[in-house]
Amino acid sequence: MLKLLSLFTGIGAFEKALERLNIDYELVGFSEIDKFAIKSYCAIHNVPENKNLGDITKINIDKIPDFDLLTWGFPCQDISIAGRMEGIKKGTRSGLYYEGYKILKAKRPGISIIENVKNLTSKRFKEQFETILKDIEELGYNNYWQVLNAKNYSVPQNRERIFIVSIRKDIDKNNFVFPSPVELKLKLKDLLEDTVDDKFYLTENGIGRLIKKNNKLLKDCQNPNIS
């Protein structure tokens, strides 16, 4: 059975993918610090909280059991266009990449899968992206990467992400390809109800309060002394 170590776990998207692909796996551990994500993850995947290795910067690598697959989507805040774009450097959230890399280097599983924002492949971060590929290749892996959009895989969401699949050279058959797009059959109109519950409509009093509030905002915006 496939043995999995999950880093920067969140609520376990990779685990859900394995489940949907009917791939049996044994979780050797996961690393997550957000208390709500931890509770959600354990409930969704029926995992005891003592499987959580906690803060990735404090993990004792020597105590991690051997595993076959490493999944990690290190923080994107310093890469994302919505963040400060400081890049992957120590001291930043995205710099936690190096913590994941240390585990990969020490354990050398058969397969590593990294997920992150598309902006990692942009001109601004090209050098850092190439460094990641070089780092992993020097550990004895072949890298395969591609930017995929969720909407092309039957998910009603326009979300682009880069996936880096790294396969250890001694087991790589050099035939890995990313999956072909899947038609998106579920549309917004399929989710909308023909009849809407009255609770979703504003009452006459509610409409009046909204108009009054908007009028006040409009008046404030027209005030030349507003700061």
What are these regions (language model features)?
Residues 32, 115, 160-161:
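Acidic-residue sensor for enzyme active/binding pockets
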